[in-house]
């Protein structure tokens, strides 16, 4: 897992340097100039970037749950690597423990947030990586994105039935008012909890660790089980890796 962190950090700096070189090359070209050194450095940076991307792919393919998450639309080698490298699956003995560590847990009815002088019970970096992954899942428009849209619709209807006014702006300081952004984040969190429960299940299952039942959710008053396999789609191609 440490290798993923090392390669990811190296890749970040190489990509940053490559972009700077490309910008320099573009600037020179606009002024009808060339700099052999810039072009040579750019070529070497691009080669190193390709090498590091290949290394990330090799590391991710060794993950116990790879056969499952490699078939999830929206999951790429980098975004999933940044998530699982921060998780100690042996310590996460239950799904709820993983949820709390990755996303924070409700305290007095509100999601835990960082407050000055107070300890937090989640990994801030992991939480950030999870939210980035959530956006990737939604953009990919796969089965997790479908679940997200279903949850967004359900939450919206529930709020309307409870007498809430849904607005586009800030809801701060207003009673019986909730913003569209708040509902969106609630739906994304639901989707992330489902994904993390599936990752937890397939990962621990592959390692022979004790597991519990899959994540349960309520739809129309009926209890349904969504299995990790139900969310799998066609094998990814190199294009969407």
Language-model segment annotations:
Residues 169, 179-216, 220-231:
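Basic, amphipathic alpha-helical segments enriched in Lys/Arg and hydrophobic/aromatic residues
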């Amino acid at each position: 897992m440490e290798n993923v962190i090392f390669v990811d950090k190296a890749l970040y700096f190489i990509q940053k340097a490559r972009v700077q070189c490309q910008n320099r090359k573009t600037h020179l070209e606009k002024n009808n100039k060339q700099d052999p050194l810039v072009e040579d450095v750019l070529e070497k940076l691009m080669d190193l970037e390709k090498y590091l991307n290949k290394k990330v792919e090799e590391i991710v393919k060794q993950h116990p749950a790879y056969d499952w998450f490699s078939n999830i639309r929206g999951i790429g080698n980098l975004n999933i690597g940044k998530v699982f490298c921060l998780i100690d699956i042996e310590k996460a003995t239950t799904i709820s423990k993983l949820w709390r560590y990755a996303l924070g847990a409700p305290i007095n009815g509100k999601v835990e947030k960082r407050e000055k002088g107070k300890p937090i019970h989640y990994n801030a970096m992991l939480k950030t990586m999870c939210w980035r992954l959530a956006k990737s899942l939604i953009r990919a428009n796969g089965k997790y994105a479908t679940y997200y849209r279903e949850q967004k619709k359900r939450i919206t209807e529930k709020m309307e039935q409870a007498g809430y006014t849904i607005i586009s702006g800030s809801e701060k300081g207003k009673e019986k008012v909730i913003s569209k952004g708040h509902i969106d984040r609630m739906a994304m969190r639901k989707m992330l909890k489902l994904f993390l429960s599936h990752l937890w299940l397939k990962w621990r299952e592959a390692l022979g660790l004790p597991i519990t039942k899959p994540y349960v959710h309520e739809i129309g008053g009926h209890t349904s089980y969504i299995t990790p396999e139900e969310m799998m789609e066609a094998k990814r191609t190199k294009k969407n890796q």
